């Protein structure tokens, strides 16, 4: 029986030598929130703890400044 090997998760921010995650970079932040607007946990994305904290802070700042929605569109 063939075994399925899950792809190893890696931190994108470590690989790209990112110093600080910017709250104005909405395109990057959108990759780390769900369709309903929740922050995706690091066990799913593979982001290191240091960058996960920065990511959460940047997403919350972007939400406060209305760059990102708090929730999805209600109709």
Swiss-Prot record:
One of its GO terms (molecular function) is structural constituent of ribosome. SUPFAM superfamilies: Ribosomal protein S18 (SSF46911). GO terms for cellular component: cytosolic small ribosomal subunit. The keyword Membrane does not apply. Keywords: Ribonucleoprotein, Ribosomal protein, RNA-binding, rRNA-binding. InterPro entries: Ribosomal_bS18, Ribosomal_bS18_CS, Ribosomal_bS18_sf. GO terms for biological process: translation. Belongs to the bacterial ribosomal protein bS18 family. Part of the 30S ribosomal subunit. Forms a tight heterodimer with protein bS6. Binds as a heterodimer with protein bS6 to the central domain of the 16S rRNA, where it helps stabilize the platform of the 30S subunit. This is Small ribosomal subunit protein bS18. It comes from Pasteurella multocida (strain Pm70).
């Amino acid at each position: 029986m063939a075994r399925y090997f899950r792809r190893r998760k890696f931190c994108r921010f470590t690989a790209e030598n990112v110093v600080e995650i910017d709250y104005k970079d909405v395109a990057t932040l959108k990759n780390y929130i769900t369709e309903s607007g929740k922050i995706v946990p690091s066990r799913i994305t593979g982001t290191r703890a240091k960058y996960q904290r920065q990511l959460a802070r940047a997403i919350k700042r972007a939400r406060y400044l209305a760059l990102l929605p708090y929730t999805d569109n209600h109709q």
